């Protein structure tokens, strides 16, 4: 059974606290916009599609509870008053993680719905209901998109390997970075969804994944997802990618994305660029799998993508259960560096240039570069 990042029931929202995984499964209830913002900011929930879903759902919850109030809040006095209240709420949610374009796409979509409903002359109650429905739709649409892009990418990759005369009798060996499965989305996943699809169709031999320091999304989250799904897998340290390519038959690297520029430059979890450079050296296809909402056509290239800088202390700490242990799941956080370091560089993301990317997959299909081109035309897949 696949893991889930968000579960809802009526007006109740709960997220799995990913900071405690894989050793403790704890659901945290989200009751306010501020709690949703904090959960995203502190990475209790992460993954571009998942944080967009949580933001949209918490916004729907905010309005749903407002409609249940008696009397209605003062900002329901007029459409203009409602707009003046809601626009700052959406802007605040967007500040939680600025690099992930899905979050911005969700807040812009809700803003568009707000303005359209006002322009149609609807009552404040009807405007609020439109926004509630739109917020829920943003989250609900994610799973279908993920399954579509996973099939597009999986079939394309398998056909490419076969057409190139590659050995895939036992299935494909695929490396991924970070965590892009059900924990990073509303379900199934993007790059990890592609791996899951290959496994489900008998076309996967083994999945490989990097630990993805300093937050260890690979060793904590991807490891747990693959184990839960019974997908054969091997973990490697981030610094072992080159060695893996030298000694094993790896057919592709598949990664997700937090933002894709118009030309195909892709921002993803730190360490992605390293893997792309080494993959190019070994002529291994490098594939980005992400929903259309991750493509930001307003950004010309990766140079214009803002890169979130995480607190320096996060690069100095690791969390896990005590080892050896007596069977309990008591966790500890320890510092692995000396105190008082002169400096710590801790970006959450890096940008892989389009020239290093073989294909970009969305729910609409697979985009490849033209002959001799170093940039993508993403028009057919957005």
UniProtKB/Swiss-Prot annotation:
Keywords attached to this entry: Amino-acid biosynthesis, Cytoplasm, Isomerase, Methionine biosynthesis, Nucleus
Gene designation: MRI1
Protein name per Swiss-Prot or TrEMBL: Methylthioribose-1-phosphate isomerase
Keyword Zinc-finger: no
SUPFAM superfamilies: NagB/RpiA/CoA transferase-like
Active site: 258
Keyword Cytoplasm among record annotations: yes
Family note: Belongs to the eIF-2B alpha/beta/delta subunits family. MtnA subfamily.
Organism, as annotated: Laccaria bicolor (strain S238N-H82 / ATCC MYA-4686) (Bicoloured deceiver)
Cell compartment(s), UniProt: Cytoplasm; Nucleus
Described function: Catalyzes the interconversion of methylthioribose-1-phosphate (MTR-1-P) into methylthioribulose-1-phosphate (MTRu-1-P).
GO molecular function, one term: S-methyl-5-thioribose-1-phosphate isomerase activity
